[in-house]
Regions:
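Core segments of cupin and vicinal oxygen chelate
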Residues: 7-47
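Structural preference for long, well-ordered alpha-helical segments within the folded cores
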Residues: 18-22, 79, 106
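Absolute protein N-terminus
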Residues: 1-2, 115
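Broad, structure-driven detector of short, well-ordered beta-strand segments within folded domains
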Residues: 48-50, 112
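Short beta-strand-to-loop junctions in surface cap/lid or active-site-entrance loops
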Residues: 11, 53-54, 115
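Residues that act as N-cap/strand-start positions at coil-to-secondary-structure junctions
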Residues: 33-35, 62, 94-96
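Vicinal oxygen chelate
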Residues: 2-11, 30, 39-42, 57-115
């Protein structure tokens, strides 16, 4: 089994796509079928899509926690600091590897691991 699709919903799709672009992702802005315009990037075989909130949602899900292995870890951490991203765990060695924990613009916790 593998993960093929991950959808994040947000009140500001461009802001969230710009944030995740700091990790080296390249997003396309498009729509298909009756879906709203949204951003889409590919990570290996997984598609990460950023959609607007549904009509019944008033805010994004802040309980979702994501983890990414980062090729240019030190450079990415520097870019995130320059961007003013909040770090809840500064880069450090853990039992799970060298990592840091940040929050995305919707306050989801994101674990970044040095590859």
């Amino acid at each position: 089994m593998d993960i093929r699709l991950l959808v994040l919903r947000t009140g500001d799709t461009k802001r969230l796509a710009d944030f995740y672009s700091l990790f080296g992702l390249t997003f396309d802005y498009h729509k298909h079928g009756n879906s709203p315009f949204h951003y889409s990037a590919t990570i290996g075989q997984t598609v990460l899509e950023i959609y607007p909130l549904t009509k019944s949602q008033t805010e994004p899900d802040k309980n979702l926690r994501l983890g990414f292995g980062i090729d240019n870890f030190d450079e990415t951490v520097q870019k995130l600091k320059e961007f003013g991203v909040s770090f809840s765990l500064e880069p450090t060695q853990t039992d799970f590897g060298f990592m840091t924990i940040i929050s995305d613009p919707d306050d989801r916790k994101i674990e970044l691991y040095k590859k």
